[in-house]
């Protein structure tokens, strides 16, 4: 059972949504620290004060993580620019934020120009939106200002910045082409108490429903959301994309449950 694939009654992935909220907000707080001189940054504050030009933040991905990163950055007074490969998501993003923001689809020249002046780049693309090519190339990173910060939240799914590396949690910070990189896989683990409470809010009612149904198998029969998270059932692979990726035969979970 893959908890991140379980859906609620509204068709939302509650585990992913909760962790994305935490990742988005935490990424901005970390970027603020990395910009400080004590962390080897440029010695600037993320945001702005009266009479001082505010810092600029570029966010790649108009999703939940991107939304909460944008809210945190805007709350600090930063200039925020958002890029995504879907006009529909960008439009929804604008509506959710309740204000006009700089948004753009992925035009290499436009993105490259924005990166030359930005102080922080946050990659928030979901795994299913990452393509074999990188949205932010190494050449674009070379053009960024020295001491700028890159936090790629999708590094464990391939990343959307060519220069990001999936590093150990104990050594996540490194510099490349004069730009500070933070390997941000499993970012919620840096705030474990908050993450644990958020996960408990998701799992407690689910576990109660499973108990009331008499077990997980009876629950799966009438709960489509729980069924969506099943990868293996009685030793049989039920996730077709996973089977295609590794060349393993998979079967429809609905057909298997009919026998129980």
Show which residues each predicted segment covers.
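Generic beta-sheet signal
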Residues: 1-3, 83, 124, 153, ...
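Adenosine-phosphate binding glycine-rich loop
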Residues: 4-30, 34-45, 155, 160-260
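Conserved active-site and cofactor/substrate-binding residues in soluble primary-metabolism enzymes
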Residues: 22-26, 64, 68, 84-88, ...
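Glycine-rich phosphate/diphosphate-binding loop of Rossmann-like nucleotide-binding domains
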Residues: 40-126
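Rossmann-like adenosine-cofactor binding region
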Residues: 97-177
